[in-house]
Amino acid sequence: MEGRSVSLRFLPALTADRRRLYSNRPHGEPVHAGSFIRKRRIVVDRELERQPKELARILVHELFHFAWVRLGNPARHSYESLVRKEWEQRARGELGWSAESRKRALRNRLRSMRGAASPHWREYVCESFCDTAAWIYSGVRRHSEYTLATRHRDRRAEWFRTAFQHGAIPI
């Protein structure tokens, strides 16, 4: 990865609600981490300091939020097309809870791809990208959240190999 530095901060008891991140507050739902793209900052729940594999998986996921915004429209549309094909094939599962939870919510909102331009769809595609990157690059080979079928995993891995074949991943 290459780009300007990204600061990392550990805080206790992270929760999030309506795109806000809290520490030690009774607001929102528990989360592992959050990224602030413009501020170039990642905040991680302090509990992960004692879980190196989970920390690696979560950190890679968060770093790829920075990669997503630098990816450019053609590559983002290409990845979206891959995910759209999975959706049309009714692929079950995902490569992380971030994408899985959004995919489940989308099933209730979208019965066809007419809503594919919605913010919910775009958020799902981004989370899918970040969870897939964490699966590929974190070194965590097995996890209970890796539920996407092998054939779809293989297609995503090939997409990443092709997209980033020329060197460093810009963040």
Short names for language-model regions:
Residues V6-F10:
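Generic structural signal for residues in well-ordered beta-strands
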Residues L11-S81:
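Active-site scaffold of zinc-dependent metalloenzymes
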Residues M1-R4, D17-H32, R76-I171:
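Metalloprotease/metallohydrolase-associated module, dominated by Zn2+-dependent proteases
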